[in-house]
Amino acid sequence: MTTLTSPHDLLAAIPFLIGYHPIDSLVLVSIKEDCVGMAMRIDYPIDQGEVAFDLCASHISADEAEGALIVAYQPHGRSDGYEVLAQTTAALSRAGIAIYESILIADGFYRSVLCHDITCCPVGGRPIPPLDSTQIAAESVVAGHPMPFASFADLGASVRSNLLAHEEQWLERVQKSCVDPLDSDLNNLQRDGATAVIDLANDFIAHGISTDQDLIAHVLGRLSEIQVRDFALGSHDLDSADGYRRMWMHLLRSAPPGFVAPVACLAAAIAYEYGDGALARAALDRAFTDAPTYSLALLLQRVFSAGWPPQSFAQMRSELHPKVCAAIFG
């Protein structure tokens, strides 16, 4: 999904860009060289002071955007959507960012405030078309992208632990592969862990899933070692990314308490890198619940909050990976 040519396209694209169907929200999409860049969503503004809107504009500016698309999902019972759009437009203009589209959504109808043709955008708006009837949805599914979650709650449910994660016997299996950082054979354990990550990833890439529970438990345990985790962070490329995303999400749901943070960070990082910011934050929340001071989670939190471009994060990861490989394999 690189270009959006109409309000209809924009409405269809937003759930794919943020991972779920937003409500009571303000969504901004950055545009660079006529292509979609970053999408960000915030709760529908209650405080309409300049500072809050300028902060949103600063994130779009940090993405080196030339222009932006704005959509306000006005909550039921509110009537200030046009004012929210005007405030957002003013903040973006102060940041030197052009406004390519500005849409108000209220009570199941949408209207572009930039369109003054009432035959195109009547005052009462037009009904929002079903997502699954749009070309954007069809193209996204053909490209291998999953349909967006119905709500933020459904997205959160996708990263919750499953029943296996709470079984005592499963915890014992994972613990057997946990790495003691003072182990005299640490380097061999690191090599074993890195190799296990690749073996499991190949299973997910080839079959979409792995039924090798021993290998899954082994990888979850080995990820407790920082070098193994960092090796895993850099192991995917463009061709293998979908398999790795499926793997980290599967392992995140299966990770027992005390082993969640490493794989949650891996799931968050790859989601962020491929533009799924909402899923990235949901996974990161699980990391903090498991280990509030986990260093990689703190780093990712700073990256996400700063609105660091995903491509910059990917570059950092690719530059780090050869160094990690050299440390593990020599």
Regions found by a protein language model. Give the residues of each.
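Charged, compositionally biased boundary regions
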Residues: M1-L17, H21-D24, G37-G330
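Short beta-strand scaffold segments in enzyme catalytic cores
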Residues: L26-S30
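Short acidic-glycine loop/turn motifs at beta-strand connectors
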Residues: I31-C35
